[in-house]
Amino acid sequence: MAQKQKCVAMLLAGGKGSRLSALTKNLAKPAVPFGGKYRIIDFTLSNCANSGIETVGILTQYQPLELHNYIGIGNAWDLDRVSGGVTVLPPYAESSGVKWYTGTASAIYQNLNYLSQYEPDYVLILSGDHIYKMDYSKMLDYHIEKEADVSISVIEVPWDEASRFGIMNTNEEMEIVEFEEKPQFPRSNLASMGIYIFNWAILKEYLEMDARNPESSNDFGKDVLPLLLDEGKKLMAYPFEGYWKDVGTVKSLWEANMDLLRDETSLNLNDRDWRIYSVNPNEPPQYIAEKAKVEESLINEGCVIEGDVKHSVLFQGVTVEEGSMVIDSVVMPGAKIGKNVVIERAIVGSEMVIEDGTIIRPEKNVDDVVLIAEGK
């Protein structure tokens, strides 16, 4: 029996991320590069470390190899513990064969034995594909104070975007009275962030109940939460007011990177009190040539800049040759940009080679974002 834990986190990291197109052709969405030196999953894992959550199960499925290698034993996030720490939980084979995760609830259900060994009081369920900084310990305090069965973190979204999210309708005490999955005509703009705290006994009971239902899609939002409400359980909404971004599309991923370049951004990567940790390769210092120009940009180690870079994010090992211009763009690790190239409002994938004289920018709608990546 493992040492008892007050709270165990379960991080859902098996998503395909098909809306990110070629960026996730051979890569799980949580492993997609972000912010010049990070992966998307770094934010959730760093939140766990900074919040004092010491036991994290990471549930993987789609294209897991690079993600598994990246996570390792969790030492980058100080989660390499003798008791607890990080455990990667892919689908596994039973006597009846391999059982793939069929939904978010299915993924947790198939790992109830992992949770049981810690006898937790609470289980924190997280998504590995959002960009945000959050103190989960404050949410846990709120959950305990409200004597909730389940607490769900919510954020106000613009009304014209509310139909894209799972929406929580609450009373004045922030108790959830109704959950609507992507409603056509929303009555609230409180969107679920996909962050849940369950009392362990409640989670176990309702996941087992859901698994016995042949008509269930085994999803928290579509099946488990509505069932809890129908049976009169106490679900509380926990309001979050910081930066949070669902980077599930090419444009939203680009927007989140551009947010880092604002003079005043609520996503401060220089916050020494809430560091974002990552696994970084050893690279030499960046080199910026005499005639190069760099403005309002994040330039990581190992970059060689001989052209112009303006309001852009460049990951490690990127080369920008003489006469080239990179504007309002994200260039992922190891990309090589030749001479006299123009790149504007684009994401250039890892290890891409852009030939001399190439022009890359939106052709029809100036508000679009161009993706240049393998398989595109």
From Swiss-Prot:
It is an enzyme of class 2 (transferase). InterPro entries: ADP-Glc_PPase, ADP_Glu_pyroP_CS, GlgC_bac, GlmU/GlgC-like_hexapep, NTP_transferase_dom, Nucleotide-diphossugar_trans, Trimer_LpxA-like_sf. It catalyses: alpha-D-glucose 1-phosphate + ATP + H(+) = ADP-alpha-D-glucose + diphosphate. It holds the Pfam family NTP_transferase. It comes from the Bacteria. Keywords: ATP-binding, Carbohydrate metabolism, Glycogen biosynthesis, Glycogen metabolism, Nucleotide-binding, Nucleotidyltransferase, Transferase. CDD domains: ADP_Glucose_PP, LbH_G1P_AT_C. GO terms for molecular function: ATP binding; glucose-1-phosphate adenylyltransferase activity. Pathway: Glycan biosynthesis; glycogen biosynthesis. Transmembrane segments: none annotated. Its EC number is 2.7.7.27. One of its GO terms (biological process) is glycogen biosynthetic process. Alpha-D-glucose 1-phosphate binds at residues 101, 166, 181-182, 192. Involved in the biosynthesis of ADP-glucose, a building block required for the elongation reactions to produce glycogen. Catalyzes the reaction between ATP and alpha-D-glucose 1-phosphate (G1P) to produce pyrophosphate and ADP-Glc. Belongs to the bacterial/plant glucose-1-phosphate adenylyltransferase family. Homotetramer. This is Glucose-1-phosphate adenylyltransferase. It comes from Bacillus thuringiensis (strain Al Hakam). The gene is glgC.
